[in-house]
A protein has these predicted regions:
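Short secondary-structure boundary motifs at beta->alpha junctions and helix caps
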Residues: 127-145, 278-290
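Switch/connector loops and helix/strand junctions flanking conserved nucleotide-binding motifs
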Residues: 81-85, 117-123, 242-243, 268-274, ...
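Generic beta-sheet signal
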Residues: 109-114, 234, 262-264
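Glycine-rich, charge-decorated loop segments at or immediately adjacent to ligand/cofactor-binding or catalytic sites
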Residues: 115-130, 218, 267-282
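Charged, amphipathic alpha-helical linkers/stalks
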Residues: 269, 283-310
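Conserved N-terminal substructure of TIR/SEFIR domains
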Residues: 1-78, 86-103, 135-230, 253-258, ...
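Catalytic-site beta-strand/loop segments enriched in glycine and acidic/polar residues
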Residues: 226-242
Length: 382
């Protein structure tokens, strides 16, 4: 049986309709993360542990942690789980004990009861923080609360994978790239929302007007933040025509960083930047209701997680094959042929393979340059 890179298990009381709904929502979201091409996307399997598995035993089926390189255990705590807290406490305690001997490759993410019920005794003894769903009263709709839960989960998974695959790299900010002329209001709304004390998701942002210090070299600061972060580009009418916006987008592409385009254009773009494509784009309608912000943040973190998963898998595969490879989390384009100095022999990108038109353009460019570089999807590297 093929071993998954990442699996998510959701633990919830079998008679909890709301927890069951949330679990199905997670299945839908993780069934295709970020960029999708020709119906193919990175999928993270989500499995449930809820109903009793063996007759006479009220506990759910045990989790085979060895079935994946990394397991994420999501606990949906609520009053109905509290009715059988002894059963769930034993189950979670045994599971967390098993996790503890796997060298920190797995992750436990508990979401507290909306009624602020006490944590399971095993978790309380370990001083385990639960996400405070009882404080999400400012979130007006079910969709808002679902997105908040997703933000917590996506951020925790990304941080966990970073601690394993890039432990020495700095914290990753969300770099909000925008044109001052017609994108500043949107950018400021996002940054203010993320940094509001009512928002319990500990995202980091970079917004130039708030971060730059007097006398600082802003170009170097921009570059240092971009090459370690996720770029959220607010593509307004003016965005593609602004040199600094082009610089920020190009820098992120050159560093193979996660990028999401937030399209807020209203009239027209006189000329699109030719290397501002080959990226996921989200149409955003900005209004007084902040729900659009959380949806956009979910898109950014989902694309970031997709890139994290692909990069980890591709680097592992390249190392096992002894390949000196360029690894790009997006389909290759002409721009990518200018980034590496020619030392790599292979460029690895996500499945599926490029279509005929795109591949012909790249192969002609490679032939004209005399460069020897094989373009392979991850599944083609064997």
């Amino acid at each position: 049986m093929m071993r998954d890179f990442l699996r998510i298990y959701v633990l919830f009381a079998p008679n909890s309709g709301e927890s069951c709904r949330i679990s199905e929502f997670l299945v839908s979201h993780f069934d295709g993360l970020g960029m999708e091409r020709d119906g193919v996307a990175i999928r993270v399997p989500v499995r449930f542990r809820s109903v009793p598995w063996i007759e006479g035993d009220p506990a759910p089926r045990k989790i085979d942690l060895e079935g994946a390189d990394h397991n994420v255990i999501v606990l949906l705590h609520d009053p109905l789980m509290m009715e059988d807290d002894a059963i769930w406490n034993n189950y979670v305690g045994a599971l967390r004990t098993s996790i503890s001997v796997r060298n920190s490759v797995d992750l436990y993410v508990p979401f507290g009861s909306t009624q602020r019920d006490p944590a399971l005794p095993f978790d309380k003894a370990l001083h385990t923080q639960y996400a405070r769903r009882d404080r999400w009263t400012t979130l007006k709709t079910q969709a808002d609360r679902d997105n908040r839960l997703l933000l917590h989960l996506l951020l925790m998974i990304r941080r966990h994978l970073k601690s394993i695959y890039a432990p020495s790299s700095p914290d990753e900010p969300l770099f909000v790239s925008h044109a001052k002329a017609d994108g500043d209001g949107t950018a400021r709304a996002i940054v203010d929302y993320v940094n509001d004390t009512q928002n319990d998701v500990p995202l980091e942002t970079f917004y130039d007007a708030m971060e730059l210090l007097p006398g600082e070299d802003y170009e170097k600061r921009f570059e240092s933040e971009i090459i370690k972060g996720t770029l959220l580009a607010i593509t307004s009418d003016a965005y593609d025509s602004r040199p600094w916006c082009v610089f920020e987008l190009t820098t992120a592409k050159r560093a193979y960083r996660p990028i999401v385009l937030a399209d807020i254009a209203t009239l027209k773009t006189s000329r699109t930047y030719p290397y501002g494509a080959n990226l996921p784009k989200v149409r955003v309608i900005v209004d007084a209701d902040n729900a659009w912000i959380e949806k956009l943040l979910v898109e950014a973190l989902s694309e970031g997680l997709r890139c994290d998963i692909f990069n980890a898998q591709a680097r592992r595969r390249a190392a096992s094959m002894g390949l000196n490879a360029i690894i790009t989390p997006r389909p290759p384009e002409l721009f990518d042929l200018t980034v590496d100095e020619g030392h790599a022999s292979t460029l690895i990108y996500p499945d599926p393979p490029l279509g005929n038109i795109e591949s012909e353009i790249l192969l002609k460019a490679l032939a004209a340059s005399g460069r020897k570089l094989e373009l392979k999807t991850l599944s083609e590297v064997r």
